[in-house]
Swiss-Prot record:
Name of the protein: Urease accessory protein UreG
Role played: Facilitates the functional incorporation of the urease nickel metallocenter. This process requires GTP hydrolysis, probably effectuated by UreG.
Oligomer and partners: Homodimer. UreD, UreF and UreG form a complex that acts as a GTP-hydrolysis-dependent molecular chaperone, activating the urease apoprotein by helping to assemble the nickel containing metallocenter of UreC. The UreE protein probably delivers the nickel.
SUPFAM superfamilies: P-loop containing nucleoside triphosphate hydrolases
Family: Belongs to the SIMIBI class G3E GTPase family. UreG subfamily.
Location(s) in or outside the cell: Cytoplasm
Keyword terms: Chaperone, Cytoplasm, GTP-binding, Nickel insertion, Nucleotide-binding
Record-linked HAMAP family: UreG
Gene Ontology molecular-function annotations: ATP hydrolysis activity; GTP binding; GTPase activity; nickel cation binding
Domain of life: Bacteria
NCBIfam families to which the protein is assigned, alphabetical: ureG (TIGR00101)
Residues the entry annotates as binding GTP: G15, P16, V17, G18, S19, G20, K21, T22
Positions of disulphide bridges: none
Length: 206
């Protein structure tokens, strides 16, 4: 179990544009902030829009949400050259020395994006049903190697013609023993399971 003497748990959240990463972050912060000391680092290419959205939503106090403008390719800032994010992590740790969890949201990326091990202790990859039922079987590191895959917006399946059983079957084939969760985080469906995963895999509970 982690204690205050341990470094904070760093949780990377990735996924394509519109999959629900920022909504998941908002819901996680609101559900976990009473129990844990939290900060968030968001990545956008040319703006700090996700930082603004989380601040307006009241996810955390504004000073606990830092926006990073990556420029160029968003994958590079979380993988090949994570220095800009590592610097942000260091700044947040100095500002909030008792922080328990640092959430790091990647910019909208494709299925090939992954977090550098030096940046993230746990990775959560978010895809959504509206992207099509074929997404899980397309694979890519985010789907096959993330610590947790979240198949989001299951409530939209009837409206986009996606088969949830097919998506579930494909996710099992692509991930093997690695866990995945199907739900709709905006509605709270699956949120408790995601929190439980973070707590158990991040050694936040004994």
């Amino acid at each position: 179990m982690r204690t205050k003497k341990n470094p904070p748990l760093r949780v990377g959240i990735g996924g394509p544009v519109g999959s629900g990463k920022t909504t998941l972050l908002e819901m996680l912060c609101k559900a976990m902030r009473a129990k844990y000391d939290l900060v968030v680092i968001t990545n956008d290419i040319y703006t700090k829009e996700d930082q603004r959205l989380l601040t307006v939503a009241g996810a955390l106090e504004p000073e606990r949400i830092m926006g990073v403008e990556t420029g160029g390719c968003p994958h590079t800032a979380i993988r090949e050259d994570a220095s800009i994010n590592l610097e942000a992590v260091d700044r947040m740790q100095k500002q909030f020395p008792d922080v328990d969890i640092i959430f790091i949201e990647s910019g909208g990326d494709n299925l090939a994006a992954t977090f550098s091990p030096e940046l993230s202790d746990l990775t959560i990859y978010v895809i959504d049903v509206a992207g099509g039922e074929k997404i899980p079987r397309k694979g890519g590191p985010g789907i096959t190697r993330s610590d947790l895959l979240v198949i989001n917006k299951t409530d939209l399946a009837p409206y986009v013609g996606a088969s949830l059983p097919i998506m579930e079957s494909d996710a099992k084939k692509m991930r093997g023993e690695r866990p995945f969760i199907m739900g709709s985080v905006k509605l709270g469906d699956g949120l408790n399971e995601i929190i439980k995963f973070i707590e158990q895999k991040g050694l936040l509970v004994s």
